[in-house]
């Protein structure tokens, strides 16, 4: 079955796709409960295994995802949507750092670099200035979010780039992936 949707024949992949399509209560970022009607009740019920399926049905209706399924994961970009929320957040930040690595390499030591290191961490800065250039040709990507926080800036740049790449796979995939991230 998983070969038909472009994934290795492995039980774990089947489970990920099933959860992604039918059980948003499993992966929904907690902040979304604050924006849906009856969110406090849904939040409490989602922790009860007997009620989780009903909460998932409610969430699918609320987010207009009922009877829409993502079944084509042949493209590696589409598979990104199967990552959990924290992994997506790290991916977006690293992708943003990659897309701006030329700019970061030109920075001289100083206050801006220190604040950047504090925001994205020493590992993130090392990744952007030392490892990202080894990835080869980095696409020119024009998007600049309106934020002063470096971590948020790079995360938004990476998220925007991924969203553009994933747009071809349809709104149901993008919506479900978005539910894994903060509202």
Residue ranges and their predicted role:
Residues 1-183:
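General marker for long, soluble alpha-helical cores
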